[in-house]
Every structure is written in C-alpha cells, then in structure tokens.
Amino acid sequence: MRTMRSTLAVCTFLLALLTSDSAWAQDTAVQEAARRAEVIAHLPPEAAKVLFGREVAPTLGPAQAIGAYERGCLSGAVALPTDGPNWQVMRPSRNRAWGHPALITLLERVAAKLPSEADWPGLLVGDIAQPRGGPMLTGHGSHQIGLDADIWLTPMPGRRLSRPERDEISATAVVAADGMDIDPTSWTPQHRRLLETFAREPAVARIFVNAAIKRALCREAGADRAWLTKIRPWWGHNYHFHIRLSCPGGDPECRSQTPPPPGAGCGKELDWWFTEEALHPTPSLPGKPLRLTDLPRACAALAAPPTSQALSVRAGVQ
C-alpha cells in the first residue's frame, strides 16, 4: 500500500509538472532551478534523467549519437559557442548547448546565410542537448542524442545580450491566444522564409511547429511546396520551432525515425489539430522514469553511479 501511494504521488507530481505551464521552455534561471530541485525530490537517484542531468562535461573521443531521439545518449558532443556572427545561445545556465557535430555545423552554416536568404538577422538558440545527451530533468522527451535543437521565433537583436538577459527574457509567441491561427501582429514573411530555409536542408528530417504555424505556412507557400512535408504540427511550439536531423552516416547505433508521409500535410491531417480533441487534450499519466537499463547498453558508460553529493549539486542550475 505504501509503495502504491508513493507511486501515485510521483505520478501526480509529474502530471502537474507537465500540464501546469505550456511555456516551460521560457522558464528563467530561477524557475528552472526550482523545477530541477522539485523533480529530483520526486525521482529515485538511479533515474536516467538524474544521472545524465548532473553531467557537466562531454565524453572524449569521436561523436556518436546512440539510440533514438527520445531514448538515447551522446558521446563526443561539441558545444555551440555562446556567441557567433549570426547566433546567440539562450538560457546558457541550463548547459544544454551541446550537440552532435553534424547539428552544430548545420546551425552555424544556416545562421550565416539567413540574413541574405531569409532577411533574418540571426538565431536565438534554445535547448539542444546535455553534455552527454540522455533524458533531461525538465522539459523535453527527446533532445537525447544531440540531433534536436530549439530555435526561438524571435529574431536576434542587433546587440549582444548579456548573460542575465539570456536567462531572463522571453521569446515572442507568434500564435493567437485561441490557437486557431498565427498572431498577425507578430508573424512576418521572414518567419516563413526562416522555416523554409531550414526545411530545405537535406540533413533536416523534421521541423516541429505549432499547428497554427503550419496552417499559415500552407497558406503562404508558393508553388514549390515540397519543403512543407518536413513541417510537422505538434503541441506547444508557439515561441520556438524544433529542428531534428536524420542520423549522420557513420553512427551505427543511431536510430532515425520513419520519414514523414508524402505530401504537403495541409489537408485533413492538419484540420484535426484544430478540433476540440487536439486543442484541449485530456492529459495522460506519465510513464515510469527511464533507467539506464531502458537506454542502449552503450549509454551506461556515459553516466556515473549516483552520489548524494552530485544530486545536491544538480538541484541548482549549472
């Protein structure tokens, strides 16, 4: 009975955590630290997200994306520099600017051409992955193998933001309050061109956006609509979009998703996202937290056994 009550308490907490704030990605450093401490308090010390969440540096050696986007890890990660000519890393205190070199290289290259191709001054880059990938204490179900990245739907300003600003300011929502369409006061033609530029990259497998953004893109796209196939509607994503790369060649343990179905995705499959069922879904209880044994075997070597000292340190934000 005690075990059942304990399990129910954990599930109730995690459900509240998942449903209380649809804009969790905009949490400030203080809010993020509080969430992490609360999560750790409700999880067993051997939970995979606790073990990977406390790692502060990558492993040495060649890069390898191991496993699937939502169940894996990353060796040999590299960090996107905090500042670049056409990008700035946001929420740096989270220490989630690590990725597979294939993704980091793509972000730097696309950022460089956005001013001329999309009239977009530069990228504000959100979460990529932890230093060794793996499940995160807060936020994402994916972003585990260094091939996912969140990009803010806010253009880079004409100055360098301070570190406190990067941890505090919020991105701009481009979706109307009722979720039925974009907000015409914040959506611009440059947003479409930004998303199209990323979608035309061969290495990009999917781009997740709010369904209202997909609706706008379907309406605004020209005759060449092939790139719309990669634009996939998903809940949230009204402040940022989420790019996902296919598995790079030479990473034998990386598991790509099945490609999106053919077609622009602008028909009945998009209409469903504006039904009551999709707009106000009934929350489901989360499953049990992943353990190292739930991940590919190679991931066990990337996360050290739990210690009380490490858990205490990771309750804050690095």
In which residue ranges do the predicted regions lie?
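Active-site acidic/histidine clusters and adjacent loop/turn architecture
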Residues: V56-V125, W187-E196, E201-V204
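Extended, low-complexity, intrinsically disordered C-terminal regulatory tails
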Residues: G53, L106-T138, F208-K230
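Hydrophobic helical h-region of N-terminal Sec-dependent signal peptides
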Residues: A9-L17
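Solvent-exposed N-terminal domain segments of exported/luminal and surface proteins
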Residues: D27-R71
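Envelope-exposed proteins and targeting segments
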Residues: D119-L124, I145-A149, A203, H237-F241
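Catalytic cores and adjacent binding grooves of peptidoglycan-active enzymes
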Residues: D27-A41, L161-Q318
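Boundary at the C-terminal end of the N-terminal hydrophobic targeting segment
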Residues: A23-A25
